[in-house]
Regions:
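Extracytoplasmic/luminal low-complexity segments enriched in Pro/Gly and acidic/polar residues
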Residues: 14, 99-103
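Charged/polar, solvent-exposed surface patches and flexible loops
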Residues: 49, 86, 103
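Alpha-helical adaptor scaffolds
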Residues: 1-62, 67, 76
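Post-transcriptional modification and biogenesis factors for structured RNAs
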Residues: 73
Length: 103
């Protein structure tokens, strides 16, 4: 749904998966994608609420990266930069090559 541009249906399906899915890993992924939809819809506070805590270490960098995007959209440059740095730190801790994020 998201790729097709149908944000309303994508949001409904992702909300269900994030809140009621049986697999914790899939719930985490659904929360991440739901936050991206909310960002696209301009619902920045709701997007940030979905990103408050990564469901697992596997998603931590992605959550932090998207949190940076939401904070940047809110005009909170310093907080966004800190979130991007947290994403880089999570990637580094996981042994992944981190791409340097710039302003």
């Amino acid at each position: 749904q998201f790729e097709a541009g149908d944000l309303v249906n994508a949001r409904a399906q992702l909300e269900w998966a994030a809140d009621k899915g049986s697999d914790p890993a899939l719930r985490g992924l659904a929360r991440l994608r739901l936050a991206a939809v909310l960002l696209q819809q301009g619902e920045l506070d709701a997007a940030l609420a979905r990103l408050q805590a990564a469901s697992s270490a596997a998603y931590r960098a992605r959550f932090d990266d998207l949190r940076g995007d939401v904070l940047a959209a809110q005009g909170k440059a310093a907080e966004a930069r800190a979130a991007y740095q947290a994403a880089i730190d999570a990637l580094t801790a996981a042994g992944d090559d981190a791409v340097t994020l710039r302003e």
